[in-house]
């Protein structure tokens, strides 16, 4: 027990514990809701009829544990992964998360399994990097409380659903960590990846700018790298616009 307790106090152990707690809690609540609600699946977007039939007519375990996650934005992301932006309404969703889902499809994964695998792996990575950043900036006790605050946040289930939030937060926290180490081009690339995950990634240029100004005497010696990092999120947004329209 002492060994387990010591392991859970390490960054990855704490991150894994937080992730598993969130994953088990949300899966349990989703399964309970699916079992008690007569109409347990609602699809609010164009969907894959074959995939929907598999979920509706599958085993009880499939209906309770998998089907509740095939709804809302997940449906759109899977559609983009399968068909690209043939449906122009889907252009409001940037392409990086669907591209990673498509990678899972190329490996033979079920579409919903691929979507959940990407988001859940990103959630675990986000918890790990968040713990490390909080521990570095403050201490281990506050890092653990930070993970707890994320897990009990009312919309934390977004992190383990087939949504892009966990991937976005993974890139965002990695961007901030790189900026704190004054690795400007890496921070800019991570901000660009966040922008290709969610449009809000464009605003990661603000903490990059602030961090550079806050440490200006050192930043001045890396001025080209800093300016290049600042430009990358905007270039990513421009590239996405060109990709969609041309």
Please annotate each region the language model reported:
Residues 25-43, 47, 68-69, 201, ...:
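Membrane-lumen/periplasm interface segments of specific transmembrane helices
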Residues 68-109:
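Short hydrophobic/aromatic helix or loop-helix immediately within or flanking a transmembrane segment
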Residues 2-7, 136-137, 180-187, 211-224:
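Membrane-interface junctions at the ends of membrane-embedded or membrane-associated helices
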